[in-house]
């Protein structure tokens, strides 16, 4: 029986040496929100605590400025 090998998660922001996450970088921020508009937790993305806080702050600022939607499921 073959075992499933789970790939180790790593923080992309630490690896790239990002100083601060910019709220105007919508392409990057969209990778960290779900289809329904929720912020993806760090245990799933592998983002470190420092950058997860910056990410949440940037997403909330972008939402406030209408750069990102609060939700995509309008019915």
Curated annotation (Swiss-Prot):
It comes from the Bacteria. InterPro entries: Ribosomal_bS18, Ribosomal_bS18_CS, Ribosomal_bS18_sf. The keyword rRNA-binding applies. One of its GO terms (cellular component) is cytosolic small ribosomal subunit. The keyword Ribosomal protein applies. Gene3D superfamilies: Ribosomal protein S18. Keywords: Ribonucleoprotein, Ribosomal protein, RNA-binding, rRNA-binding. One of its GO terms (biological process) is translation. GO terms for molecular function: small ribosomal subunit rRNA binding; structural constituent of ribosome. SUPFAM superfamilies: Ribosomal protein S18 (SSF46911). Belongs to the bacterial ribosomal protein bS18 family. Part of the 30S ribosomal subunit. Forms a tight heterodimer with protein bS6. Binds as a heterodimer with protein bS6 to the central domain of the 16S rRNA, where it helps stabilize the platform of the 30S subunit. This is Small ribosomal subunit protein bS18.
């Amino acid at each position: 029986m073959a075992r499933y090998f789970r790939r180790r998660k790593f923080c992309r922001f630490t690896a790239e040496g990002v100083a601060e996450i910019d709220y105007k970088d919508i392409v990057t921020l969209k990778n960290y929100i779900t289809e329904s508009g929720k912020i993806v937790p760090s245990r799933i993305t592998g983002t470190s605590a420092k950058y997860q806080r910056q990410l949440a702050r940037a997403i909330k600022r972008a939402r406030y400025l209408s750069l990102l939607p609060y939700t995509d499921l309008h019915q």
